[in-house]
C-alpha cells in the first residue's frame, strides 16, 4: 500500500512542536458532552500565531451561528477561508491527518481546490476548521488515490473505534470513528455541524473508480488524549 505524503506534511510535523498547545490551568474552559463522558478541555489561547487562532475560532463560531448558509454551493467548498501566508507562515499546510490503522499521514489544506486535493487532504470551506471546540464538524476531503499515492483509497477499511489524529499549528487532537455513512452528493445535511458535538468527517468518492456517484463518510468524535492508552502512537 503506497501511502506517500506530500513533502510539506513531513516538514510540518518536524516543526509543529515549536508551537505547543497551552492548557488552561484554571480548568474553567471545559465542556461536558454527556455526564458519562470524560471532560475534554475547550481550546484556549496559544502562545504562537495568536491572531490566526482567534480569527479561525471566530470563523468556526460564525459559520455555526449562521447555519452554514453557503454549504450547498459547490464553489464555496474550494475558496480557502484563510491563507497561511497572510499570517507569516511559509506553507499553506494547516495540519496533518494521521490514521494509524491505515498507516497514513497526509497534509491538510484549507479549501478543496484542485491543487490542494492533488497535494493531500483538504478542509471543505464553510465547514469547521479542524482545531477542536464544541459545535464543530471539520469535513476533510481526500481523493481515493492520486498520482501514485493512495490517499483515502482504503478509507473503507476504517471501523468504529479506530483512531484519527489531527495535528494542527497548536495541538494534537484525537478522534474516534463513530459512524460510517454512504450518501448522495446532494445530501449536504449529512455534513453539517451537529450542535453540542465536536466532530471531524472524512469524505471521499464512492464506490472506488466510479466517477463519484456517491460519497463515503467517516464520522469521528473527539476523545481525550491519553498518552499511556492503547491509542498512543510513536
Language-model-derived ranges and their functions:
Residues 1-159, 163-234:
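Solvent-exposed, non-transmembrane regions of membrane-associated and secreted proteins
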Amino acid at each position: 500500500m503506497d501511502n506517500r505524503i506530500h513533502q510539506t506534511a513531513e516538514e510540518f510535523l518536524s516543526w509543529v512542536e515549536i508551537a505547543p498547545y497551552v492548557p488552561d490551568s484554571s480548568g474553567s474552559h471545559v465542556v461536558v458532552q454527556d455526564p458519562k463522558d470524560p471532560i475534554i478541555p475547550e481550546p484556549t489561547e496559544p502562545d504562537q500565531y495568536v491572531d490566526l487562532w482567534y480569527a479561525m475560532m471566530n470563523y468556526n463560531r460564525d459559520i455555526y451561528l449562521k447555519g452554514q448558509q453557503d454549504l450547498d454551493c459547490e464553489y464555496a467548498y474550494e475558496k480557502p477561508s484563510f491563507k497561511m501566508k497572510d499570517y507569516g507562515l511559509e506553507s499553506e499546510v494547516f495540519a496533518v491527518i494521521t490514521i494509524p490503522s491505515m498507516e497514513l499521514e497526509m497534509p491538510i489544506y484549507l479549501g478543496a481546490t484542485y491543487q490542494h486535493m492533488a497535494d493531500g487532504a483538504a478542509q471543505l470551506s464553510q465547514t469547521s476548521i479542524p482545531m477542536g471546540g464544541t459545535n464543530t464538524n471539520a469535513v476533510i476531503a481526500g481523493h481515493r488515490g492520486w498520482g501514485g499515492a493512495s490517499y483515502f483509497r482504503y478509507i473503507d477499511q476504517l471501523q468504529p473505534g479506530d483512531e484519527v489524529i489531527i495535528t494542527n499549528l497548536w495541538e494534537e487532537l484525537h478522534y474516534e470513528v463513530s459512524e460510517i455513512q454512504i450518501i448522495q452528493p446532494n445530501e449536504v445535511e449529512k455534513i453539517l455541524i451537529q450542535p453540542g458535538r465536536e466532530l471531524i468527517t472524512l469524505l471521499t468518492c464512492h464506490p472506488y473508480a466510479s466517477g463519484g456517484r456517491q460519497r463515503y463518510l467517516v464520522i469521528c468524535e473527539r476523545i481525550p488524549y491519553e498518552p499511556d492508552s492503547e491509542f498512543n502512537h510513536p
